[in-house]
């Protein structure tokens, strides 16, 4: 599909998209021509054309953005509290698949995730049950994520809690800031002993790494609410350090 505009593929599954029907059809015919050139055919019974909504690899793709598929939502919503470590891993696998829809997931899921650590005795208590219920609530209330657009103003916001790092990639589209993706990560035992300023700085680094596929080579804004970091990285402060 190299050189064909508006087409995504995963293995032998193809999605062709366009901003309107005319653009969609032009791109679709280009893809069909390419397949014909290399001697490939498609199964008409498995094709869906001119759709405004499509479920693809656990995601519901619409003209307005991306949502978790109803199948993924139901799997989490209907899950029972885990009874052993194997069931914990299975549940967390379901949750992690939809992680980009869930802010501060790592911190929220930490009481459950801790049960998978080596040497930890499995014990499902009140803290794990609260985390389980909050995760169910969070995913079922997930907002629609926007599609990333190269031409739009882009911002990464990062924050740190005592036990985890959280970040969000957003863009200003049509005069409104929309979420592209959330990301989060638990702190290691060593990182938990960092000062808060060090944690906040680490959050910025990890956020840029996590969203590097979007922002590498692009101009973007990096936002933190930690005032000491703003001071440390301000141009005035850096110039003063160089002067000394």
Per-region residue spans from a language model:
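C-terminal accessory regions
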Residues: 221-223
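Short, intrinsically disordered, charge-balanced linker/junction segments flanking boundaries
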Residues: 238-244
């Amino acid at each position: 599909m190299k050189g064909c505009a508006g087409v995504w593929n995963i293995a032998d599954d193809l999605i062709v998209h366009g901003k309107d029907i005319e653009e969609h059809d032009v791109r679709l015919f280009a893809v069909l021509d390419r397949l014909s050139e290399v001697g490939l055919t498609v199964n008409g019974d498995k094709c869906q054309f001119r759709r405004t909504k499509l479920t693809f690899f656990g995601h519901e793709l619409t003209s307005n953005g991306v949502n978790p598929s109803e199948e993924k939502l139901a799997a989490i919503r209907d899950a029972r509290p885990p009874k052993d470590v194997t069931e914990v891993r299975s549940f967390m696998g379901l949750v992690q698949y939809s992680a980009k829809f869930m802010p501060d997931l790592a911190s929220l899921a930490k009481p459950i995730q801790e049960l998978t650590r080596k040497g930890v005795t499995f014990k499902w208590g009140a803290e794990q049950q609260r985390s389980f219920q909050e995760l169910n609530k969070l995913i079922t209330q997930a907002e629609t994520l926007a599609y990333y657009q190269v031409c739009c103003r882009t911002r990464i916001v990062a924050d740190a809690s005592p036990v985890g790092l959280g970040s969000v990639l957003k863009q200003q589209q049509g005069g409104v800031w929309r979420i592209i993706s959330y990301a989060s990560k638990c702190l290691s035992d060593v990182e938990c002993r960092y000062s808060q300023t060090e944690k906040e700085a680490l959050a910025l680094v990890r956020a840029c790494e996590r969203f590097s596929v979007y922002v590498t080579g692009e101009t973007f804004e990096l936002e933190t609410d930690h005032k000491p970091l703003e001071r440390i990285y301000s141009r005035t402060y850096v110039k003063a350090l160089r002067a000394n």
